[in-house]
């Protein structure tokens, strides 16, 4: 288990370094990260289309400006613009190279392929294998299904949007894409919270061994997770719209959060969106995991002396599941931290009227690019983390991916035998433990 955990840690460190190097390379080349890949959290800033142009990042209601150089009068002021309308523009021009677009498209294709293979295989393992249909695994399947919807619908559209520059899909798809993105993130967050609570309940009731099947409360949890996630994603569908502006004499359509919302609620949502995303979609799962894993550790230490030998194998399995859930939460935190950090730093440190803002803006662009790519990786990395950490999932992945040529009956029989073997052994040990207790009490 330690070797698997260390391999998982090394893989995550390598992923962080690779994304960091790619982001720094894009900054040196002058690529704009915020537009390179559409933000999964719905960034409010707007980039100019993928051509060589100057770029200025403004407030929440900033819109695109023409890339033509501003005419400066003898007094040093921009012609036709009041002195206090805009801050002095950044002197540095940001260029979008075709090489960058192709590299980002390749990364999106890799995420698309790995995400479909990994998440669909994970769903197949849990669906076909009766012994894998328990509470925690059903929650993991719900998480994988949400990631799969995001991968199938959003990633191809975002990659095409980068290559095309203009938004060609209409207002309906402009509302659907951020809606699915937000719903997918909500399903991930709430599923991780439910898994953390479930692990504490399992350890707190360590003497009760559950059989095969999905508890009714787990089914209710999954329904609530999907309903709440969909409801919380509705403001994205309401607020996003296709904004048409003039760019070099041609109309340019951009899918973005409309800076001019019609209702008071949507205006408040636009203003408080970044803080809401950071608190609910990032801090909440980390806080719940920290609280319930602390309680779980205290419970295990308190009952360690009273645990019976007959239950050791079953407790080891529960500890393995707890480590697996903790690894999923850790992967989520590492993948989403750079993007949330970029948003919070912009809200707290970035001042549009500061003449020295361009240096901070350059750093935020690099961090934003790293965060967007790592957030996309979170949709395909969960099956990989399960493969590295959990022995049961690792064996099931191997048998599922390496036995495609077998008949359906052979594959089903092999999966059931492999996964049910340990469960039957543990159940037999628990029966012996109960019979010994009855004998001693009589």
Swiss-Prot record:
It comes from the Eukaryota. GO terms for cellular component: nuclear membrane; plasma membrane. It is a multi-pass membrane protein. Gene3D superfamilies: Rhodopsin 7-helix transmembrane proteins (1.20.1070.10). The chain crosses the membrane at residues 102-126, 138-163, 176-197, 219-243, 272-296, 325-350, 363-389. Residues 1-26 form the signal peptide. The modification Phosphotyrosine is found at residue 439. GO terms for molecular function: endothelin receptor activity; G protein-coupled receptor activity; peptide hormone binding; type 1 angiotensin receptor binding. CDD domains: 7tmA_ET-BR (cd15976). Residues 27-101, 164-175, 244-271, 351-362 are extracellular. Keywords: Cell membrane, Disulfide bond, G-protein coupled receptor, Glycoprotein, Lipoprotein, Membrane, Palmitate, Phosphoprotein, Receptor, Signal, Transducer, Transmembrane, Transmembrane helix. The keyword Nuclease does not apply. The keyword 4Fe-4S does not apply. Widely distributed in cell types of a variety of tissues. The modification Phosphoserine is found at residues 305, 419, 440-442. It is found in: Cell membrane. A lipid is attached at residues 402-403, 405 (S-palmitoyl cysteine). GO terms for biological process: aldosterone metabolic process; calcium ion transmembrane transport; calcium-mediated signaling; canonical Wnt signaling pathway; cellular response to lipopolysaccharide; cGMP-mediated signaling; chordate pharynx development; developmental pigmentation. Residues 127-137, 198-218, 297-324, 390-442 are cytoplasmic. Disulfide bonds join 174-255. Glycans are attached at residues 60, 97. Pfam families: 7tm_1. Non-specific receptor for endothelin 1, 2, and 3. Mediates its action by association with G proteins that activate a phosphatidylinositol-calcium second messenger system. PANTHER family: ENDOTHELIN RECEPTOR TYPE B, G_PROTEIN_RECEP_F1_2 DOMAIN-CONTAINING PROTEIN. Belongs to the G-protein coupled receptor 1 family. Endothelin receptor subfamily. EDNRB sub-subfamily. This is Endothelin receptor type B.
